[in-house]
């Protein structure tokens, strides 16, 4: 059982404070760190920040850390719960918080403990973390995912004019995760050369998630650059393209989207309606091998979401729309608004609820894509999560910046450990199991 738990402040990949939790059992120390997003959905569980502008620009997490050390820890130790009782531990903490969005203790406090318990539970049972997660979800097999590498950054993640937040490559034609990594990294380096030749060396500086942020305004130009890099690498037909538009970031009001939202007092020439935006995506899909579009519209623009989803066979992913929240997922299912859940553990705030969100999506015929946040740490829990939940797809940045590679490298190790029994999602990434 749990002998000691201690939380502290550490720093994420953007230099912002976040919560880290050390949990001790007779099997040793188990450490977990909590990630943080830049473009956060209004319906997410509450990430507790102190708001004291004189410290860390208001982003300190002293209260969340204090809530772990002074509230959660004494109660959970007193309860006598074991680390193998993930569901019971998570339910206990949620009850202790008592609010729907974890605003009393903070989702970042609860999640830190929940992740550490999960790691300790696997060790207690003497099994790998991914296998423990599979057991928690009642899965017999595990599957290695197709990585979605975010190679061009725009939106709130980059200082360029590009409105759409992420342009990704998915090596669906690979036969193993190792091969997918080779294909992804080779295209990444070709893309760097293409951007350098066209825009100069300073255009190859990287954004928060390791992708390039060339100063382009036209979203189609980003797709052209990627297509050229795929061709140069010799992977045409083997690598497909995904997008995360994060359209809530440039939604104005009255169904108007501003593709030049980063220019203050712009001339309004880039303002378009939801239907025009949908037409733009349809054009993209005709001209490029696009297989997945995330958050194509504002998080409350249900009608345009449903129109888009009913009118295309590609994967439409809900992130800001669903925020890993069962209530939002249920509404999206009823409205047929999307076809895939983006799973972010810190949007819902515990391991059990994350697994439940995936199972709810799967039950309704959706896919699930596991995701990092733009403010990441070296913790690679989501690598084991994606393998254990057999979701078949993960996005955790470009093959650049160690907090991104930490996850991809862990999946490589898992593939090696599974040996000849390793199953790779490949072309079936949307419904691998």
From Swiss-Prot:
Localisation: Cytoplasm
Residues annotated as catalytic: 209 (proton donor), 344 (proton acceptor)
Pathway: Carbohydrate degradation; glycolysis; pyruvate from D-glyceraldehyde 3-phosphate: step 4/5
EC code: 4.2.1.11
Domain of life, source organism: Eukaryota
Binding-site positions, Mn(2+): 244, 294, 319
Residues that, per the record, bind (2R)-2-phosphoglycerate: 36, 157, 344, 373-374
Activity control: Inhibited by 2-phosphoglycolic acid.
SMART domains hit by this protein: Enolase_C (SM01192), Enolase_N (SM01193)
Record field: catalytic activity: (2R)-2-phosphoglycerate = phosphoenolpyruvate + H2O
GO terms for biological process, alphabetical: glycolytic process
GO terms assigned for molecular function: magnesium ion binding; phosphopyruvate hydratase activity
Gene3D superfamilies given in the database record: Enolase-like C-terminal domain, Enolase-like, N-terminal domain
Keywords, in A-Z order: Acetylation, Cytoplasm, Glycolysis, Lyase, Magnesium, Metal-binding
Residue(s) carrying N-acetylserine: 1
Cofactor list: Mg(2+)
InterPro entries, per the entry: Enolase, Enolase-like_C_sf, Enolase-like_N, Enolase_C, Enolase_CS, Enolase_N
Gene Ontology CC entries for this record: phosphopyruvate hydratase complex
Free-text comment on the cofactor: Mg(2+) is required for catalysis and for stabilizing the dimer. Crystallized with Mn(2+).
Keyword Transmembrane helix in record: no
Subunit text: Homodimer.
UniProt family annotation: Belongs to the enolase family.
UniProt protein name: Enolase
Species for this entry: Homarus gammarus (European lobster)
């Amino acid at each position: 059982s749990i002998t000691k738990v201690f939380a502290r402040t550490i720093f994420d990949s953007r230099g912002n404070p976040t919560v880290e939790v050390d949990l001790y059992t007779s099997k040793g120390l188990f450490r977990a760190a909590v990630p943080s997003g830049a473009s956060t959905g209004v319906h997410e569980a509450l990430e507790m920040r102190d708001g004291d502008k004189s410290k860390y620009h208001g982003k300190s997490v002293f209260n969340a850390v204090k809530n772990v050390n002074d509230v959660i820890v004494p109660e959970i130790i007193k309860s006598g719960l074991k680390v193998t009782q993930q569901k019971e531990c998570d339910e206990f903490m949620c009850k202790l918080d008592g609010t729907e969005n974890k605003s009393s203790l903070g989702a970042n406090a609860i999640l830190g403990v929940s992740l550490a318990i999960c790691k300790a539970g696997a060790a207690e049972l003497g099994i790998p973390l991914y296998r423990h997660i599979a057991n928690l979800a009642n899965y017999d097999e595990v599957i290695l995912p197709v990585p979605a590498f975010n190679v061009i950054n725009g939106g709130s993640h980059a200082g360029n004019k590009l409105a759409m937040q992420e342009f990704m490559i998915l090596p669906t034609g690979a036969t193993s995760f190792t091969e997918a990594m080779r294909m992804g990294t080779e295209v990444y380096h070709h893309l760097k050369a293409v951007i350098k030749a066209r825009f100069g060396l300073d255009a190859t500086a990287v954004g928060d998630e390791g992708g390039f942020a060339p100063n382009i305004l036209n979203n189609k130009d980003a797709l052209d650059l990627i297509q050229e890099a795929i061709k140069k690498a010799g992977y045409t037909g083997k690598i497909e393209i995904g997008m995360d538009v994060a359209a809530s970031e440039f939604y104005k009001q009255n169904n108007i989207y501003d593709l030049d939202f980063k220019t203050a007092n712009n001339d309004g020439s880039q303002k378009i309606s939801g239907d025009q935006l949908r037409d733009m995506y349809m054009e993209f899909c005709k001209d490029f091998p696009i297989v997945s579009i995330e958050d194509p519209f504002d998080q409350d623009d249900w009608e345009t979401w449903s129109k888009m989803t009913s009118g295309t066979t590609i994967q439409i992913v809900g992130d800001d729309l669903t925020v890993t929240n069962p209530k939002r997922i249920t509404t999206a299912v009823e409205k047929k608004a999307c076809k895939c859940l983006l799973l972010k553990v810190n949007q819902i705030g515990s391991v059990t609820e994350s697994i439940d969100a995936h199972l709810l999506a799967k039950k309704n015929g959706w896919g699930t894509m596991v995701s990092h946040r733009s403010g990441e740490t070296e913790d690679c829990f989501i690598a084991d999560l994606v393998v254990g939940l057999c979701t078949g797809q993960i996005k955790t940045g470009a093959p650049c910046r160690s907090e991104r590679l930490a996850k991809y490298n862990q999946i490589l190790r898992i593939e090696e450990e599974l040996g000849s029994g390793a199953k790779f999602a490949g072309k079936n990434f949307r419904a691998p199991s």
